[in-house]
């Protein structure tokens, strides 16, 4: 992955964290890694644990972030969430939700990125 894409991804994740904190969620972890992959953000809203995938794009030439979650990716996110709950010693299975935050950073001077939060993907 190019340095530009990595920097864009980090920027998007930072924006997403600010956005979900402003919405009143508690961020539990960022960039949770396990043998099955990585979860961008894990947060809590009340009693619900939310696993959040962040997709940041600067152009729609390959599709926007909200168009990029496949069934295979969704399944991998579920497996990572199961790993997280098991290895964080949750005694009971909490209420879960999987969200997507898509960030569009179009190159228009002075324009704030568009943040699209899709709950329950």
Swiss-Prot record:
Origin, by domain of life?
Bacteria
What the entry lists under Gene3D superfamilies is as follows: 3.40.1350.10
As one GO molecular function, the record gives:
nucleic acid binding
Which Pfam families does this UniProt record tie to the protein? UPF0102 (PF02021)
Stated family? Belongs to the UPF0102 family.
Name of this chain's protein: UPF0102 protein DSY2577
According to the entry, what is the taxonomic lineage of the organism? Answer: Bacteria, Bacillati, Bacillota, Clostridia, Eubacteriales
């Amino acid at each position: 992955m190019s340095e530009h894409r990595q920097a864009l991804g980090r920027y998007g994740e930072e924006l997403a964290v600010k956005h979900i904190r402003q919405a009143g969620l508690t961020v539990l972890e960022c960039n949770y890694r396990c043998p099955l992959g990585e979860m961008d953000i894990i947060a809590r809203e009340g009693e619900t644990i939310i696993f959040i995938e962040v997709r940041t794009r600067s152009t729609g030439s390959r599709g926007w972030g909200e168009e990029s979650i496949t069934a295979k990716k969704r399944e991998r996110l579920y497996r990572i969430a199961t790993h997280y709950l098991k290895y964080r010693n949750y005694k009971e299975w909490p209420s879960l939700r999987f969200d997507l935050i898509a960030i569009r950073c179009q190159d228009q001077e002075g324009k704030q990125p568009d943040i699209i939060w899709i709950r329950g993907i």
